[in-house]
């Protein structure tokens, strides 16, 4: 077991429902995680750096980010710092709803990821159940610039939501 260590990245997945309701799904995963009840959500984060798979597919944070959310726990919102980039994932409600991705890199801004379905900022606002007055434009503004750190961008996103 390799406990999650500082500097290995950061990650949090927010799924609908209680931690107890998500327990079975979480036990079947390839990474060891902890779950905590939050108002309206369950927060899921890593407790070990490595997944139960062989390299190069053993990076726990990437496995957690890419893990599909069961339809009963959707919508889900993932917030990660991976390889120096801020990564936001959303899996909306719906039987075959695909996971969407937004990747922001310092000095470059939002990056195109040809192999990953893009995540419109309006979808982030809609999934999170934002407060009245928060617009998709406000969410887009978080990722408009190219300066700052990935963690700063994610914290700013949470403050907007």
Segments predicted by a language model, with ranges:
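Glycine-centered flexibility motif
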Residues: 2, 7, 93, 129, ...
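Broad structural signal for hydrophobic residues in well-ordered alpha-helices, predominantly aliphatic
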Residues: 26, 67-68, 124, 157
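Short, intrinsically disordered low-complexity segments
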Residues: 30-105
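Long, compositionally biased intrinsically disordered terminal regions
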Residues: 105-161
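Short, extreme N-terminal segment that most often corresponds to the first beta-strand
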Residues: 1-28, 36-38
């Amino acid at each position: 077991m390799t406990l999650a260590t500082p500097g290995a990245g950061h990650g949090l997945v927010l799924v609908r429902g209680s931690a107890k309701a998500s327990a079975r799904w979480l036990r079947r995963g390839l990474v060891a995680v902890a779950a905590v009840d939050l108002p309206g959500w369950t927060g899921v984060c890593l407790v070990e750096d490595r997944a139960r798979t062989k390299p190069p597919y053993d990076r726990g944070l990437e496995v957690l980010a890419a893990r599909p959310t069961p339809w009963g726990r959707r919508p889900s919102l993932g917030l990660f710092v991976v390889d120096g980039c801020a990564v936001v994932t959303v899996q909306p409600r719906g039987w075959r709803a695909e996971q969407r991705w937004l990747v922001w890199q310092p000095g470059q801004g939002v990056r195109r990821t040809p192999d990953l379905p893009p995540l419109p900022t309006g979808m982030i606002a809609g999934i999170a159940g934002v407060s009245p007055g928060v617009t998709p434009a406000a969410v887009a503004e978080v990722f408009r610039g190219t300066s700052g750190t990935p963690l700063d961008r994610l914290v700013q996103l949470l403050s907007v939501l």
